[in-house]
A protein has these predicted regions:
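Catalytic cores of nucleotide-sugar-dependent glycosyltransferases that transfer UDP/GDP/TDP-activated
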Residues: 2-522
């Protein structure tokens, strides 16, 4: 085995006047800016063994927000639990782990090949790497090939990841370490909860849903290849197709989402993606909850190496320097008017059509719009046309650049986030940390993280007229320096660390484990 060093392995397996466009979500009579620390945790066993299973991790490979969570949350937990990450051995992972050593092996089953398990470390966290070159070492991204098409064998690839997690939990991977709890993330590893039950394991599983819209749907004929009998397939079949996400929801001991509001919204038909009845049942039985994501400590305007100039609550000059840098980078002229930013994938979910619809309004009122991102060709073309139509007011950077994105958060005055749905969202928290006020649709995690008139501005309906009224509020806010400064301070001081989220996850782990004990004794 070329990638792993062999070792001995056991044999056993306030708001300005006229704010009628504001969202009536949470009104507050005054601005608040309070620094907080995580509350006492209470009873938690620091030796709790948790296997955090993910299909991406920003240390190695990232396709979306899950990669950020998978890198940050285990780090926040590592001093308070024995947490280890399991991730597929993509090319990027193998290349980034020269010290990889063999610690176990998952035997073949049905159409799923045998895989080796290697171990490395990332940020002090043990990372278990599922090594199977035929499944994971190829070009493209974790989920799609170079042309943007789903890998044709994704069912087998992510069943292998799911099954590996279950085999490790059952103690049949030849490893000295065995988890007490599986923490599964999204559809690529959700099938692990089903495998656990089918294998007769007592290890509980927690499934975190980062986006219910992605469900891992595959032909029913794939069941035999995945080692799933016709009887077993019944519980994971969604409208005639195998659903990895449904498998996790049905068989996990608890399901949580990445915000409290999103957990509530997915129990209804509008955002339940066909699984709302199932999720409503979970909510009624106390098996559905929400925990808001945190953001990494590197998002600090006092120290961020990507910024043109640093700043803090007492020295704002650095924001102006970053604003000028963004204007130059996007070919926009010097302007003291408000700069609105879009830092997003250019896709329908993110409401880019709404952002484009307010471009004329922003330009006519003396503002500028800076857009960075890539995505759907139709939306990319619409954004490019806007920059040609308003060359002095709309600047576009196609694709993504981490340094420029951070400068946009640090230099822009407002961030447009008219998402049609948003399980949690990270951009609004990045913006707040850098004193950029989110203008957001009141949905999902945006409700939980943006306090209307305090740490940003909210609007209720995902339509252009509602966004236009909210943009008008933004212009009025910008023209009242004292209000703008107070809101920026409140946004920058909003608690958003992973330590806070980590504490909530540790509580949830204990809750899931405690609930399992009476069930086993029954």
């Amino acid at each position: 085995m070329s990638h792993l060093r062999q070792i001995a392995v056991p044999v056993a397996l306030p708001v300005p006047a006229g704010d009628e466009g504001g969202a009536r979500v949470r009104r507050t009579p005054r601005l608040r800016a309070v620094e907080t620390t995580p509350p006492p945790l209470g009873r938690v066993d620091p030796a709790r063994r948790v296997l955090f299973v993910t299909s991406e991790m920003a240390d190695y490979v990232k396709a979306g927000g899950l990669g950020d969570v998978a890198a940050a949350l285990p780090r926040a937990l590592r001093t308070r639990s024995d947490v280890r990450v399991l991730i597929p051995g993509y090319d990027e992972v193998i290349a980034g782990a020269p010290d990889l050593r063999l610690v176990g092996r998952v035997p073949a089953r049905a159409g799923i090949p045998a895989c080796d398990i290697g171990e490395t470390f990332a940020g002090g966290v043990p990372v278990l790497v599922l090594v199977c070159p035929g499944l994971f070492q190829r070009g493209g991204s974790p989920y799609v090939d170079g042309s943007g098409q789903d890998w044709s064998d994704n069912a087998v690839r992510f069943a292998a990841l799911s099954r590996a997690a279950a085999v490790i939990a059952c103690g049949n991977a030849g490893m000295e370490w065995q988890p007490e709890l599986l923490h599964l993330n999204d559809w690529p590893c959700a099938l692990a909860a089903a495998y656990l039950r089918w294998y007769g394991s007592d290890v509980p599983a927690l499934l975190t849903v980062h986006n219910l819209a992605y469900q891992g749907l595959f032909p029913l004929e794939d069941a035999a290849v995945l080692g799933v009998s016709p009887e077993q397939a019944e519980s994971i079949t969604f409208h005639g197709r195998l659903s990895f996400l449904q498998a996790g929801i049905v068989h996990a001991d608890h399901v949580n989402t990445v915000s409290v509001s999103y957990a509530r919204q997915i129990t209804g038909p509008e955002q339940g993606c066909g699984l709302d009845a199932l999720l409503s049942g979970h909510a009624a039985s106390g098996r559905l909850s929400g925990i808001v994501n945190g953001i990494d400590s590197s998002w600090d305007p006092r120290t961020d190496l990507h910024l043109s100039e640093h700043f803090d609550l007492h020295r704002w000059e650095g924001r102006v320097a970053n604003k000028r840098r963004v204007q130059r980078a996007l070919g926009l002229p010097h302007s003291d008017g408000p700069l609105f930013a879009v830092v997003s994938r250019l896709v329908h979910q993110k409401g880019l059509d709404l952002s484009c619809a307010v471009a004329h309004q922003i330009a006519a009122a003396g503002g500028q719009l800076a857009i960075i991102g890539g995505g759907e060709p139709r939306i990319e073309a619409e954004v490019a046309a806007l920059s040609r139509r308003f060359p002095s007011c709309v600047g576009v950077y196609p694709g993504f650049d981490e340094g420029l994105a951070r400068k946009m958060f640090a230099g822009a005055d407002f961030l447009l986030m008219p998402s049609r749905f948003e399980p949690c969202g990270l951009s609004q928290m990045y913006a707040q940390r850098f004193g950029c006020l989110p203008i957001a649709h009141a949905t999902g995690g945006l409700i939980d993280t943006v306090e209307d008139g305090v740490t940003g501005l909210l609007f209720n309906s995902a339509d252009a007229d509602s966004l236009r009224r909210c943009v008008q509020r933004a212009f009025r806010t910008y023209r009242i320096p004292g209000l703008l400064s107070a809101m920026r301070r409140a946004a920058m001081l909003r608690p958003s660390s992973w330590d806070l989220a980590g504490t909530e996850y540790l509580r949830l782990y204990e809750r899931v484990l405690d609930a399992r004990v009476p069930e086993l004794q029954a």
